[in-house]
Amino acid sequence: LPVDQYIGGIEHAILHLLYSRFFTKALRDLGYFNLNEPFNGLFTQGMVTHVTYKNKKNEWVEPKEVEEVDGVLKDMSGISVDIGKIEKMSKSKRNVVDPNDIINSYGADTARWFMLSDSPPERDLQWTDTGIAASFKFMNKLYEFVDRYKSYSPDKINDHETIEFLKMAVNKVTENIETFQFNKSVAKIYEFVNILNEALNSRILSRDNFTWSLKKLSIVLQPFVPHLSEEIWSGIGSDTLCINESWPEEKIDKRAKVKIAIQINGKTKEVIEIDESIKKEGVLDLVKNNEKIKRNIKDKKLIREIYVQGKIVNLVVK
């Protein structure tokens, strides 16, 4: 004692926290040890929620028993179903999703990825079929790197900037894990993958740096999707286990850095730090691969790109 970090839902605050603090202080007062608090840190995670359903008999209906027939929601017996509130998953309201069904359909890694990527861990997470399907699609996209690795050959190698971007992404993954901002770590992994894909499509990445990139990717994926991480690690020819590798601490090329404000229609949405020497094309590529910016311009038409060197990128969309 004390425990470094207590992680638990707010519903346990009375039983677990109150009693443990009471006994700690009682034992302190009795002279058994000199300790005021049993936990150094406290983190309360959010709940997993799901939409609720009720049929015309006022009975709760499980999500998997609901289907759309001619534009009307019905249960398995054909009775019309009404959509209720989004609430914490509970057996009483039958708004639960069987983990075995998810694992059998998508795999455990997909479930982990979706739950860690969709919202900050201190907030509630709404479970959706579209969300889990999108995560599954990304898992397959990650494994495609193994096939690309086997057949890849570079053209004109020019990958210094790419590697520096990837190093920065790796370091950001680490920073966000340490502060429990797992969704931000996931966003940086998306960014890593997008940058790597662009380099491969342009064939500017050397074979050695492709190997380096996939090794780093496998390691930072390990806390999120451990099974897929090992598959990628093995797929590029490693005969060890990825989980036994040391966590990467990347040294960034110590060139001058500048902060760039990214605007959409004149409104600042993100601020990033980049190498001062990066040319306009490289800056715009980095901006367009930023996950937050991609979400903001999704389904919109890009009209114009304005770049004020070392200061601002403004994307005009409609």
Regions found by a protein language model. Name each.
Residues L1-Q5:
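Short glycine/proline-rich turn/loop motifs
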Residues A13, L18, F22, Y32-P38, ...:
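Helix-rich, typically C-terminal accessory recognition domains appended to large enzymatic cores
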Residues D29:
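Active-site palm subdomain of RNA-directed nucleic acid polymerases
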Residues N36-G46:
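Short, surface-exposed recognition loops and adjoining beta-strand edges that mediate ligand/DNA contacts
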Residues T44-K54, Q222:
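Short, conserved secondary-structure transition motifs
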Residues D155-K156, I260-K318:
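NTP/phosphate- and nucleic-acid-binding module
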